[in-house]
Amino acid sequence: MSLNAYLVLAAMLFTIGVFGIFLNRKNVISIMMSIELMLLAVNINFVAFSHYLHDLTGQIFTFFVVTVAAAEAAIGLAILVTFFRNRTTINVEEIDTLKG
């Protein structure tokens, strides 16, 4: 496949992720999945440019992005589980009512 095909695929995935955030603002899990989809699109760009430029920097950077994304997802889900235990909902509109 050519570089353009990878860039079009990444652009489509990123656009789907952005639309997922804007169209579904009430569910935290859907928002987190959309963010992960956007990170996947960025990683595809890194790997595609790294392959076509014959430089391993993009592929190595992708490993760091995947690691940070996994940590972000784990922390986000842990916060979400704690929030669900306290409020019995995962509605985004309820999150701003936290005491602090």
Swiss-Prot record:
It is a multi-pass membrane protein. InterPro entries: NADH_UbQ_OxRdtase_chain4L/K, NUOK/Mnh_C1-like. It is found in: Cell inner membrane. Keywords: Cell inner membrane, Cell membrane, Membrane, NAD, Quinone, Translocase, Transmembrane, Transmembrane helix, Transport, Ubiquinone. One of its GO terms (cellular component) is NADH dehydrogenase complex. Its EC number is 7.1.1.-. GO terms for molecular function: NADH:ubiquinone reductase (non-electrogenic) activity; quinone binding. One of its GO terms (biological process) is ATP synthesis coupled electron transport. The chain crosses the membrane at residues 3-23, 29-49, 60-80. It catalyses: a quinone + NADH + 5 H(+)(in) = a quinol + NAD(+) + 4 H(+)(out). Pfam families: Oxidored_q2 (PF00420). It is an enzyme of class 7 (translocase). NDH-1 is composed of 14 different subunits. Subunits NuoA, H, J, K, L, M, N constitute the membrane sector of the complex. Belongs to the complex I subunit 4L family. PANTHER family: NADH DEHYDROGENASE SUBUNIT 4L-RELATED (PTHR11434:SF21), NADH-UBIQUINONE OXIDOREDUCTASE SUBUNIT ND4L (PTHR11434). NDH-1 shuttles electrons from NADH, via FMN and iron-sulfur (Fe-S) centers, to quinones in the respiratory chain. The immediate electron acceptor for the enzyme in this species is believed to be ubiquinone. Couples the redox reaction to proton translocation (for every two electrons transferred, four hydrogen ions are translocated across the cytoplasmic membrane), and thus conserves the redox energy in a proton gradient. This is NADH-quinone oxidoreductase subunit K. It comes from Magnetococcus marinus (strain ATCC BAA-1437 / JCM 17883 / MC-1).
